[in-house]
């Protein structure tokens, strides 16, 4: 139980630091951190910050933010981290990205490589792409589509095994 309390407090501290960094660097509209059942979720809208439209190469503006996130994720090296790429429902058909599946997966992998390059242990990381399958908003409007184009970095909760942490009578 003590480790669960520690994790909750640590997630809250990291959340607050990410939000403060985003505010102080003008990214508050693009970066949101929430604590959910699956863990600490850092949502970064990709437009004008991480990637150009239809691309998976990090833009220069992303370096400071992702460096800060990497540093904060390294405070506790026990929690696994998943990086999930998401797109809107506008189809992409390029030689590099035949569909949104390839684009979202490549964007997640690009962020994973950045985090590894900034000290996050690769054993903690996974990358996945959701294409347009997990929207957080409607794809009917430009604003909704922009919110769906995102990368989520999830510092996952560690669930105790059955009986772990329980004392014997």
Where are each of the predicted segments found?
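Juxtamembrane linker/hinge segments adjacent to a transmembrane helix in small membrane proteins
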Residues: 1-40, 44-50, 161-169
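Periplasmic OmpA-like peptidoglycan-binding domain that tethers envelope proteins to the cell wall
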Residues: 14, 52-68, 72-79, 86-169
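Glycine- and acidic-rich phosphate- and metal-coordinating loops
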Residues: 43-45, 82-87
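Residue-level recognition of the N-termini of beta-strands and the immediately preceding loop/turn
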Residues: 29-31, 40, 79-81, 123-125
